[in-house]
Regions:
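Non-catalytic DNA-recognition/assembly elements of restriction-modification systems
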Residues: 68, 72-170
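Polybasic, glycine- and aromatic-enriched phosphate-binding surface used to engage nucleic acids
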Residues: 1-87, 91, 154, 162-170
Length: 170
């Protein structure tokens, strides 16, 4: 969704059949599979989103141009690590399906999120963290610092290695 509650730990993301028309309040990722679903459903991506997204009142306002296009995806990912993310993403879908009377909004209510769905997200985070080689903390600040370092490397900014300018003390 373009706008999501600030109370949610994860933005509810899912698949829809080809006959579904997306409104201007949804984003679509054509050709996305389980790997993309997993990456976008992870704490890593959600930490990035909470830092880079705009706001509509206090809710997060997701942007393709700012959040998605600038998200520093992991580099070369082995087939085994990719499969681990895909499998964990499918487990999230399975956990959601176990609650057929609940909407995505219901499932991602932080006060009512089912334990099996929360556990599936924990397993996904472990798999996604492994794709990055991330061994830092589980808090957003540590994740975002890691992602910004990756972003700088991908963008070729080399800010950490830039020569500092000498001050003119004259």
């Amino acid at each position: 969704p373009k706008v999501s509650s600030e109370r949610r730990q994860f933005i509810p993301i899912g698949y829809f059949d080809p006959t579904t028309l997306a409104s201007d309040l949804l984003f679509i990722v054509p050709g996305a599979g389980s790997y993309e679903l997993g990456m976008l459903s992870s704490s890593m991506h959600n930490a990035w989103m909470r830092t880079t997204a705009g706001r509509l009142e206090s809710r997060y306002r997701y942007s393709v141009h700012v959040v998605y296009n600038n998200f520093p995806w992991p580099g070369d990912v082995s087939a085994a690590k990719r499969e681990a993310v895909e499998s964990a993403a499918r487990a999230i879908l399975t956990a959601r399906a176990a609650h057929p009377d609940s909407t995505l909004s219901d499932l991602y209510d932080p006060d009512a999120m089912p334990d099996d769905l929360r556990d599936a997200h924990r397993a996904l985070d472990k798999a996604v963290d492994a794709t990055y080689g991330y061994r830092g903390g589980k808090d957003d600040a540590t994740r975002v610092a890691f992602l910004f370092e990756r972003y700088q490397a991908l963008a070729g900014l080399g800010l950490a290695s830039a020569n500092p300018r000498k001050r003119n003390r004259g």
